[in-house]
Regions:
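Terminal targeting signals and extreme-terminal segments of soluble enzymes
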Residues: 1-145
Length: 145
């Protein structure tokens, strides 16, 4: 199959998965379904796992930095929501260390410090070979209920 058909077929599959539900809630919202995110929690860590598909790649054939940033943001935001309630990102800093070309990716969000009015979180993204590909730190503010 040529590259164009692979991207077209993968993109159609991703869209069908996202359209499978109209839920817009933590753990299952349109963008997470579209990107194929599997979200789980272990102890004080939120794990976002997904498989790299051709529509997620940039023209160089590696996972697009925006997808990496999205997965890391989701891992931290979902952890905050899971432990203390919904919040919003005030700032996020990302370091890209290694390219991700294919395979299954694991992203782990955790707390650096839980404050009363501000949360400091971090996220680490690992390639399928378990090498650290990117890491992020972020400042979050809890949203009032």
């Amino acid at each position: 199959m040529n590259d164009f058909l692979k991207i077209k077929n993968d993109g159609a599959s991703m869209a069908l998965n996202a359209e499978s539900s109209d839920k817009q809630e933590f753990g299952s919202f349109y963008l997470s379904r579209y990107l194929g995110f599997e979200i789980s929690y272990k102890n004080d860590v939120c794990v976002v796992k997904f498989t790299v598909k051709s529509p997620m790649q940039n023209p160089q054939g590696t996972l697009h930095g925006g997808i990496i940033a999205t997965a890391m943001d989701v891992s931290m935001g979902h952890l905050l929501h899971h432990t203390t309630g919904a919040g919003a990102t005030l700032e996020m800093n990302i370091k890209y260390l290694l390219p991700i070309k294919e395979g299954t990716v694991n992203c782990e969000g955790s707390f650096l410090k839980k404050g009363k009015t501000i949360g400091f979180l971090q996220s680490h993204m690992y390639r399928e070979d378990e090498k650290l590909a990117a890491y992020a730190s972020a400042t979050w503010i809890p949203l009032k209920k």
